[in-house]
Structure formats: C-alpha cells, structure tokens
Amino acid sequence: MASAAGAITRLARVAGPAAVPAILYGAYKQNAVAAIEAFFTGPGRTSRIVALVVVLWNWKSLPLAWTYRVINGMISHLLVRNLHTYTPDKLFQPIKTETHVTLLEVDYNIHKSNSTYFADLDVSRTHLVGHLLARGLRAISSNASTKLVMDPSDPSRPARGAFGVVLGGVQCSFKKELKPYQRYEMWSRILSWDRKWLYIVTHYVDKGAVKSGAKPEDWEKKIHASAVSKYVFKIGRLTVHPAVLIEASGLLPERPGGWVKVENGLGEEPNGAAANGHAAPESAVWDWKRTEKERLKGLEYAEHLASLDGLLDQFEPGEDGPLGVFGPG
C-alpha cells in the first residue's frame, strides 16, 4: 500500500501542476460550458438527469470506483493531510468511514450482498492504517535513508526492497441485514498484533447510532456485521515486525527490552498485579503495561483468525476427483 502511495505521490508532484491548466484548456477548446448547458436544458434532459442521479448515487459500484476509493485514502493521509501527533493512548482508538448500500450491491434477498462487505473493508482499513500509521509508513517507505529496519544478514546496512502492505486474511460475521440505500458507518481500529501480523477489527454500525463516543442503548442491535483482518508488512521478502511501524508512528510507550525483542511474556503482570496476588490500581499514565494488556486482550480473538491458516491441510481432491464441474462460476 505504501509503495503504491509513494509512486502516486511522486507522479502527483510532477504531473499535478501541469494537469490543471491542461484540463482547463481542453474544456475551453471543447466548449464544455455549452455541452453542460445542453445536457441539462436540451431535449431529453429529464431522462439524462435521472440517469445522472442514478449513476451518482451508485457511483461506488462503478468500474474503477473501488480503486479510486482506496487510492484516495492513501493519497489523502500520506500526501495531503498533516501527520498526526497522537500519543500511545490513541493506539486502539477507532476511525469512522461512512457510506451507503448501492443498487448494484443488492442481492436477490433485497439486501446488501455479503460479498460486497469486503470491498468496503478495503477502504476502511486503508483509512485506518494510512491515518494512524502515516508517520511510520513514510519512514519505512524510505528505509534506505531512515534505516528503520536493518538487514538481518548484515545489520550494518538497512534492509532493501520495495515496501508493501499485504492483506493476509479476513473473517466477517454477519449479524443483521443492510437494506438498499441504507446508510451505515464502518468503525475500524487496531485489535492486536503478533510477530508477523497486524490485526484490525471493523464493525458495521447504523449511521448516527453512536453519539459522543458512548455505546448506544441496545448497541448490539445497531451492529450489522463485525470483521477481523490481518496485514503483514514487507520490505522485499523481509517481514517487518508490526511494532516497528507502530513505534515509528509514536504510538508505543517505552518498554523494558523493547517491543520487538520481547516476544514471550511481559516480565511482570500487564495488569500490575501486586505481590499479594491482588491487582494493583491501574496507572493514570498510559504505559507499556496498559498497551500490552490491550494487545493481549485483542489477541485472544485474533488468534482464531490466525488458526485458519491451518485449513490448507483440509483440502481434499476426492477419491475420484470432484463430483461435478459446473459453471458459470
């Protein structure tokens, strides 16, 4: 994701200043104003206007619309917006994206098709990672100069290769249907991470159901679906520990031994258990113990998604091959 955004950023810086006058000149030569006027006032204008409204209201399902939505998320957070200055207590906080069910997303049950939830997830995750981890993404995409990740085979030089963010899996649980043209929100946040994967949880919620950061009354009835996704970060063939990126984004408090080196256990109880076995009062300061406590809590759910990688062993071609070959598929 970041490597693509970097290429787009460089292209925009070069082509952007030249593109605007070129577009304006082209519109002038083609008499665009007269064409627009004829569209809205000429014979057959009613059908054209109705068709335009339908297209605009369903634009997210048009060809290349998904590509635009994802790339727009990359550019807006990595190029246009100022980098955030969040502190570690914001690491597990959500971002929200808003959209609606289009006509082309509706299936024969007259509700949003289950398959279309995943396209929305791509967009929401892009906004979350692009916004929350923008500082780390910028640093690691220029790893040759920032030296954020060193080459394991030669620790004296930085790891080299194209940086990329790869989706490793998604699991979605559907709770309640979304009806045609119904508006809804996607609330995405970091759930947890391990040595390889960054886990993200997303909830599909009724638009306007959440007020002032508090759960609404009967909030379970406001959630239409919940999904967990996992990302892996790569520099060439090298897997980058998610904590490297999170720490470079200023979202991890200092931890004895460091976040990457400490792989098993905490050295002490994450809830600050006292010597008598009773939990000590939680510190008002967001320290590494609170971050680790939240990470481990989310990991209990994330590990279920990770365990699905073992399903590869369950592939069975059948004793005599498939029972049938059917299409169209």
Sequence positions of predicted segments:
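Fungal secretory targeting signals
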Residues: M1-S3
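HotDog/MaoC-like acyl-thioester-processing domains
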Residues: A5-N82, L178-P180, R189-G329
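Hydrophobic beta-strand-centered segment that forms part of the acyl-chain substrate-binding groove
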Residues: G26, T126-Y184, I190-S192
